[in-house]
Amino acid sequence: MVTNDTLPPPEKVVPYETVDGANGGALYLYGNTNAPNIAVCCAGYPDDHSIFQSFAFRLAKEGDCLVGVMCLPGFDDREEKPWTTHKYDGYTFDDMVISVRGAVKALRAASTHEDSKLTGIFHDWGVVPGSLWVNRVLEEAESPELQPDKMVYFDVLLPPHKVMKNDIPDAPKPTLARTVVEIVYKIVLAISFLLQQYVSKILGVIFYSVGLVAMYILRLYPLYHVDDKVFSAHQKHLNRTIYMAYPYWFLVKSVWNGTFWAYEMSLHKDLKKTPLLYIYGGNKRTHFHRNESVALLEREEREGRSDSKVICLEDDGHFFYVTNEDACLDAVVSFMKN
């Protein structure tokens, strides 16, 4: 496994627009600018660019691809923009989408190929703004250059689009244990952010630490030890880690005040036009996907409705694109070139 000390450096770093301004984000570029394929990669909590750098480096070579690595707003640290200068309240779902859109624009501008095919690759919390972006941009006739040709989601999958509600295959209901695990860790992270940012930094750290220990003791922590080395290699100090939990705070707050349902947090509706590859690790205490969406994609592949498909890496956890880079890379390259 590649560590932070051996990460392949980007060949170029270009700015992209966020709510913080024209230079709000930094896009790490890998590969030939005239490659026929381009891909934007974005991870989730609690990761900056580094988690995707090794994967992007190899994807650029083996997939004949220009790859741009971004991260969620507020998740990166640069000399000219330390994390303490990011928005104190964190970034809303709409803010995150603006960042994805800005990164795609910058990636398109960096590409010199006349007809490059765009793939979006998103992991964990990156899937949320990735899904919102693709749902919105596919409805914009005036922005064809920003529309992806294919999408790839790692380990998180949102519900089917509302237009599919009458054509969803049967799928098993999540167990009570799985539901409890999913709710508990989200609430712990949301409250940790709330306490640190608005009450006391010490209280935030105490609540986060006690909550983490309690989840381990009660076997409510969603991941197994297969992912421990990845966390260790990309670990940040506690205040930084807690600040990066702002998506959980906005999630809990939006569900509480009823605004969550206004967002198009779902799969995109036309899987034939824009095929979707979903890869997930099977070695976890819970899964971060909707079972009906997995069943939907499995039917797409089984019946040949689209090029969409699902792959489960049974022995891997949440960070399989780090711990089992070869298998993940093979699947993504094959999907992009199909």
Model regions and ranges:
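A short loop-to-beta-strand scaffold at the N-terminal edge of the catalytic core in hydrolase folds
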Residues: P15-G31
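Flexible "cap/lid" subdomain of the alpha/beta-hydrolase fold that forms the substrate-access gate
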Residues: P46, I51, F75-D115, T119, ...
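Conserved HGGG/HGGXW glycine-rich cap/lid loop of the alpha/beta-hydrolase fold
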Residues: G31-E80
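Catalytic histidine-centered segment of alpha/beta-hydrolase-like enzymes
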Residues: V310-E325, L329
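An N-terminal hydrophobic leader/cap segment in hydrolases
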Residues: M1-E17
